[in-house]
Amino acid sequence: MMFFRYSFSQFLIFCLLIFPSCKRSTIRESIDMKWRVVQNDIGNNIFLYEGHNPDVPLRAWAVLIPLEDNQIRILVSDDKDGVSTTSQMSSKLGASVIINGGYFFRGQTPIRHVGLLKSQDSLYEPASNSVYRDNIKYKTNRGAFGIYHDNSVNIAWASTRNDSIFCWSSPFKNRPGKPASINYSLSKFWNVKEAIHAGPILLRNKALIVSSEQEVFFNTPVVGVQPRSAIGYKKNGDVVMMVVDGRQVVSRGVYLKELAMLMKQFDCEVALNLDGGGSSSLVVNGELVNNPIGLKSEREVMSFVAIIPK
C-alpha cells in the first residue's frame, strides 16, 4: 500500500530509470561526441567540459587538470560508517574537483575496499590477489591509479606482497576458464604514496586495450552498459577525470570500449575505469555536475580521487 503514497509523476520517473529502453544496445565503433567548455573559472587552469551525443544517446563531463598547479590526492571516507558522498568529501577537504574512486563491499561491517587502497602512505587495504569465477581461482593484478611523492601519477597493473606494492607493464593472461599464474619476477616495486585499485585499464600508449578479461571482470556487470567514471592522464602529465551518465532516456551509459574512446578524445595516454553505476559522481567547486542514475542525489562511497589547490 505504500506504493500509493507516491505521485504518478514520481512513479513514471522511476519506470524510466529502471526501464529506459526495451532495445538491446550494441557497442559503437565510434562516438561523435560534441564537447564544449562549460566552466573555465574553476581556478589553477582547470577546465570543465560537457559532451553529448543525441543519437546514442549520451551525456558526459570531463575535467582537464594540470598537476603543476594542483595537488592530487586519494581520499578515504572518515565517516563512522566508512562511506560518504562525493559532495561531502569535497566540502570537508575544500577540493576543487573530486570524483568517486574504487569498488567496495557494500553491507559489510566494517566496510572494505575491493583491492588496493593507500592514502598518505597508509595502506588501508592490500590488493585482492585472486578472485573466483565459477569455482575457479584466478590470480589478478588489476588496474590501479598511483600518485608518487612528487605529485606525478601513473596507471599500472598492480598487486601487493607483504604490504609492498608491485606493478606490471601488462596484465596476467587470464581467460574465462583458463587462469594465469603470477610472476613477480616481471614486476617492479611501485613506490607510490597513494594508490587505488579499480579497473579495468582502458588505454595504454593511447591504444584501446580494455583488459577486462585479463583482470577477471568477465561475468560481472562491469562489462555491460553502465554509468561510468574514469581517470587518465596525457603525455604532459595533465590529468583527465570523466563521468558518463547512464540508465536514463537522455543518456544510456557506455560499454568499457566506448569509455576508452571518450577518454582518448582528450588525448589520454593511459586511462582507468573507476567504480561506476550509481556510484559515478563528479563534483566541481562543490557542485555535483552529473546526474547519477537520473537523480540529483548521490550514493555514499568509500574512496575518492580529489584535486586540492596548491
List the predicted regions and their residue ranges.
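Bacterial Sec-dependent N-terminal signal peptides
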Residues: 1-29
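Zymogen propeptides
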Residues: 23-160
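A short catalytic or substrate-binding loop motif that flags glycine-/basic-rich loops and adjacent residues
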Residues: 54-57, 136-139, 194, 221-225, ...
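Short glycine-rich loop/turn motifs
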Residues: 58-62, 142, 197-199, 226-230, ...
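Short acidic-glycine loop/turn motifs at beta-strand connectors
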Residues: 66-69, 146-152, 203-206, 233-237, ...
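Conserved, well-ordered active-site substructure
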Residues: 108-133, 213-270, 279-310
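Active-site-adjacent helix-turn-beta-strand microarchitecture at beta-sheet edges
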Residues: 109-213, 220
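Alpha/propeptide regions of enzymes that mature by internal proteolysis
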Residues: 272-274
